[in-house]
Amino acid sequence: MTELGGRVALVTGAGRRVGRALAVALGARGMHVLVHYNASSDGADETARLVTRAGGSAEVFRADLAVVAEAERMVDQLVATRGALDVLVNSAALMLRTPVGETSVTDWDAMFALNVRAAYFLSQRAAPALRASRGSIINIADLAAFETWPAYVPHGMTKAAVVQMTRALARVLAPEIRVNAIAPGVVLLPEGWSEADAEHLRGTTPLRRLGAPEDVVGAMLYLLDAGYVTGEVLTVDGGRHVRS
């Protein structure tokens, strides 16, 4: 197991849902965690409390990651104050229902700005510090990168881009930095989905349940400990990818 105690992590979108679980798990390994948020200030404060309670330390930082300068400033400030960066988790994402024929340029741009552009420029800015620490980048992709979801075509396209980015950066940044991704299935029910939607998903998933944040946490911890793994996209979807 990799010793993470006292090391430094940055988790984007850590104010709620899966991002919070990832941040708290890193705290439980003794890390100092920068809890990034944009709109969920109270949620970020709660995440920081949970990180501390788990045995780590935390700070919160607000940034609109769609603005590259804000994303870069967050990395710069963390490295300047802590002196290092060991783990970057690109978890922040935007998933909008955008059926073909109803997709607006505004929604398209918002998803690509956060899901793809922000993750790339954060990784680029963090690379010198991660190289010095022989650190790791973990990107949160999505099963939608490999499946076709008719009402979420642009979202799936952004996650396919995250997969390609992961593989390319793994090659470019080796050997000092490992870059991997996690492609979850449905982990927690997306906002606006009904219990009927949930039941349908359970019935079409081989393991007959939805995912939990802890499932993604387990994948993240494996990838952090797996020193001979890079460029991997670990699918965590209850077996949905083997249905066909």
What are these regions (language model features)?
Residues 31-46:
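Conserved glycine-rich Rossmann-like NAD(P)H-binding loop of the short-chain dehydrogenase/reductase
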Residues 129, 212-236, 241:
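C-terminal substrate-recognition "lid" of short-chain dehydrogenase/reductases
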Residues 91-96, 238-239:
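Conserved NAD(P)H cofactor-binding loop of Rossmann-fold oxidoreductase domains
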Residues 94, 101-120, 138, 155-158, ...:
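Catalytic Tyr-X3-Lys loop
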Residues 99-100, 107-109, 193, 201:
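Substrate-binding pocket helix/loop in short-chain dehydrogenase/reductase
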Residues 128, 170-175:
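Alpha-helical segment proximal to the catalytic Tyr-Lys
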Residues 41, 62-73, 105, 214-215:
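The beta1-alpha1 cofactor-binding region of Rossmann-like NAD(H)/NADP(H)-dependent oxidoreductases
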Residues 15-17:
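Conserved glycine-rich cofactor-binding loop
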